[in-house]
Design a protein with these regions (language model features):
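Thiamine diphosphate
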Residues: 1-166, 170, 174-177
Length: 177
């Protein structure tokens, strides 16, 4: 049975935590929704719930990155580009820090919560920031690849995640470039 993209993301983070001792996950009080709770269950000592304080979460991740950690920050996509933008721009992107962003419920996939939770402009905003890589995924195989790629690449990287179950477009063993 197919799984929601955000669940694949959470599972992959937990798997990466098994081999990357410097991987830490921060979440803005939505770990059940972003599925970063799967990482928390596997690695509770490397999970930080920052509460509804996205700018603080981004600034904390910047500090962690300067000490050798690979932080993944997680919240709804709309809050990555609104509530945390100053820290992203001024600290993470200008500093080319190794911080990863998991933007859940991107686009209109959070229709139930209304227009305030739609992230339609997230890629437009983030592509204007220096050093930012953007990975907009399309299915489960690409989500696994993108999460692993983000963990290994250097510098800031945004993974745009849907809330929904998406049909498989690629075989699980597809080689992305």
């Amino acid at each position: 049975m197919a799984k929601a993209i955000r669940e694949i993301y959470g599972e992959t983070l937990a798997e990466l935590g098994n081999t990357m001792e410097n991987l830490v996950v921060l979440d803005a009080d939505v770990a059940g929704s972003t599925k970063s709770a799967l990482f928390k269950a596997a690695h509770p000592d490397r999970f930080f719930d920052m509460g509804i304080a996205e700018a603080n979460m981004a600034a904390t991740a910047a500090g962690l990155a300067t000490t050798g950690y690979v932080p993944f920050i997680n919240t709804f996509a709309v809050f990555i580009t609104s509530a945390s933008l100053l820290a992203l721009r001024g600290q993470i992107c200008y500093g080319n820090l190794n911080v990863k962003l998991g933007g859940a419920y991107a686009g209109m996939s959070d229709a139930r919560d209304g227009a305030t939770h739609h992230a339609l402009e997230d890629m437009a905003i983030l592509r204007a920031l220096p050093n930012m890589k953007i990975l907009s995924i399309s299915d489960a195989a690409e989500t696994r690849w993108a999460t692993r790629y983000a963990a290994q690449c250097s510098g800031p990287c945004y993974i745009r995640l849907s809330r929904d179950v998406l049909p498989d477009l690629y075989p699980q063993d597809h080689k992305f470039t």
